[in-house]
Amino acid sequence: MKFPTIKSKKDSLYITLFFLFSIACIAGLRYEQRLEMQKGIAEKIIRFHVIANSDTKEDQDLKLAVRDAVGIKMSGLLKDAADRSRSEAVIRKNMEDMKQTAEKVISERGYDYDVDICLTDTDFPVKTYGAYTFPAGNYEALEIVIGAGRGHNWWCVMYPNMCFSNTMYEVIDEDARSSLKRVLSEDEYQQVLASGDYQVKFKSFEILKGLYDEK
């Protein structure tokens, strides 16, 4: 591509400012688009969040044991839930049972920690599950807080099921992929089917470079 030659420093300044302004506008629009995309994704999924009492090995192991016990039960309860609304209703209906399940695991391991469990809106960082990267933002989640809740946490996507697979580990099987593709729009699905690298290459940089190269 042939670019016009910059004839003076004044021209150079004007052109630079123009392109910087254009880049800022494009970046702002893309940011707004990502926010809207995240909100759209959040409206269609439910996440699962377990917070340990502390970061000691014992408390972290306990967190995973609670995760497994609750996860196995919820996996069975949610397997026939047709949509997000139905999944939310099943979770709310079984909240007390899930709390008792967590308390039983804690007691059997010799601890007397309190357990708080709720379905709540929670801020999540960017999180990758296999090939899927979910943008940071606010999501509804089944949240379990063990004891003081000061330890590292664990999270996954509860609906559609992306974390319960027999042994409860994050194994994204074909059913999970199909379910996710079914509940998200094509644009939303392509958004999460990313590496997590959100860097944007603007054509403006190429144009600006070309202008200076031909000075």
Question: Which residue ranges define each predicted feature?
Answer:
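Soluble periplasmic/extracytoplasmic beta-strand elements of cell-envelope proteins
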Residues: I45-I51, D114-C118, A141-V145, W155-V157, ...
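Glycine-rich, aromatic-bearing surface loops/beta-hairpins
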Residues: M1, E188-K215
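Aromatic-capped interface at the extracytoplasmic side
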Residues: A27-I41
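Soluble extracytoplasmic domains of inner/organellar membrane proteins
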Residues: Y132-Y198
